[in-house]
Amino acid sequence: MMGGSSSRIAAGLGAALFVGYCIYFDRKRRSDPNYKNKLRERRKKQKAAQEKAGLSRLPDLKDAEAVQKFFLEEIQLGEELLAQGDYEKGVDHLTNAIAVCGQPQQLLQVLQQTLPPPVFQMLLTKLPTISQRIVSAQSISDDDIE
């Protein structure tokens, strides 16, 4: 019995210390005069990184016309960049197009027939990450609405 009560006391004491630690650093953070500036800078960097990834100009996935326009633009940009030899950016644009495509399997089959195997392999490796970023970007925009 004695071991059980002492472990409860230790757990309670640990929890109290943790809460105190959180409160201390929260107050320290809020009283920092540069906190808002640091927060603005961090948000600015995140926005710049998102724009660099091409996700800030994602269409509203509920607007079929905007999605179709985005899809066609991404395919065209991807093809142009691949023709210029910029495989990395070209594949990025093609993965954006695949991510918003209504029938991605058919598009992948067409791309597999038309793209050189190394470029198609690069496309396949980037697909999961771009799809995940689009899903997270869409959920962020849904959170902004609420």
UniProtKB/Swiss-Prot annotation:
Which superkingdom does the taxonomy of this entry point to?
Eukaryota
Task: Say which family it is in.
Answer: Belongs to the Tom20 family.
Location in the cell: Mitochondrion outer membrane
Which stretches are tagged as biased composition: Basic residues? 37-47
Output this protein's name.
Answer: Mitochondrial import receptor subunit TOM20 homolog B
- UniProt xrefs under PANTHER family: MITOCHONDRIAL IMPORT RECEPTOR SUBUNIT TOM20, TRANSLOCASE OF OUTER MITOCHONDRIAL MEMBRANE 20
Q: What does this protein do?
A: Central component of the receptor complex responsible for the recognition and translocation of cytosolically synthesized mitochondrial preproteins. Together with tom22 functions as the transit peptide receptor at the surface of the mitochondrion outer membrane and facilitates the movement of preproteins into the tom40 translocation pore.
The record's section on SUPFAM superfamilies has: Mitochondrial import receptor subunit Tom20
Q: Where is this region: Disordered?
A: 37-56
Q: Which residues form the signal peptide?
A: none
Q: Which gene encodes it?
A: tomm20b
The membrane topology term of the UniProt record is: Single-pass membrane protein
InterPro entries per record: MAS20, MAS20_rcpt_metazoan, Tom20_dom_sf
